[in-house]
């Protein structure tokens, strides 16, 4: 598999809400965010999920994941950190690769590891 093919297979999942991260247009740049940031995508009264990742952070993470793939250390359960982004490879098959992420700079510590319905 080429690096380009590898990158196209990656799907980022919010580590707080277990939802697929969305590519969104910010004021100056594109970025990924949890869909539960938007009020329409969460139950009434639930706080917004602040998990997000810039394109720069995404590219650094993809570079790290590609290096792991090249070194034959890439497998489900692979965990690590790239800057403020903590990641874990969840699923790997012929069609896609899911990577769960939490940006520790944008997500409150007390939210990490808790059931989102409690927040």
Language-model features: locations:
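Basic, low-complexity terminal or inter-domain segments flanking catalytic cores
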Residues: 1-119
């Amino acid at each position: 598999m080429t690096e380009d093919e590898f990158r196209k297979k990656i799907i980022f999942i919010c580590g707080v809400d277990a939802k697929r991260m969305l590519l969104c247009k910010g004021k100056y740049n594109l970025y990924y965010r949890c869909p539960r940031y938007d009020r329409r995508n969460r139950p009434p009264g639930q706080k917004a999920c602040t998990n997000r990742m810039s394109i720069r952070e995404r590219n650094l993470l993809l570079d790290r994941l590609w290096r792991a793939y090249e070194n034959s250390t890439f497998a489900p359960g692979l965990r690590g950190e790239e800057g403020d982004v903590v990641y874990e490879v969840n699923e790997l098959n012929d069609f896609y690769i899911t990577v769960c992420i939490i940006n520790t700079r944008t997500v409150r510590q007390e939210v990490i590891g808790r059931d989102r319905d409690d927040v």
